[in-house]
Amino acid sequence: TKYVVIDKIDKEMALVALSPITGRTHQLRLHMHHIGSPIIGDKKYFKNNTNDLQNDKDKFLKLHAAIIKIPDENLLKAHMPKHFKNSLEYYGLNLKKDEYVYNLFLEDKNWKLKIN
């Protein structure tokens, strides 16, 4: 999994763009858990509720496929669900611009870290 930090709140929480390499089941969720940064709302890999900053009423998994890149095809883009937008606002995280995230997928040099 490759990732880029888009925005963060100190060391408590970050909004990241993730890019799977193999496409294995739960790859993104498992890798984020492995590096100590589980995805909020992930009841499978994030069972420790004492560190869960999810104080809002929304308990959905905070994982969204905003852009899917199919080899030799165009990028597919999906609108962010309302519950995800509400959570970003609640936590004070800034997506910046949709074009920012879109451009991450166009230039491989933007990806900073690879999780094995």
Whereabouts are the PLM-identified features?
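Short beta-strand segments
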Residues: 1, 14, 26, 72-78
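Glycine- and acidic-residue-rich catalytic/RNA-contacting loop of pseudouridine synthases
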Residues: 1-15, 30, 44
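Extended aliphatic helical segments
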Residues: 4-5, 16, 67, 101
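A structural micro-motif recognizing beta-strand termini
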Residues: 18-21
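Short beta-strand segments enriched for Tyr within beta-sheet-rich domains
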Residues: 24-32
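Pseudouridine synthases involved in rRNA/tRNA modification
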Residues: 31-116
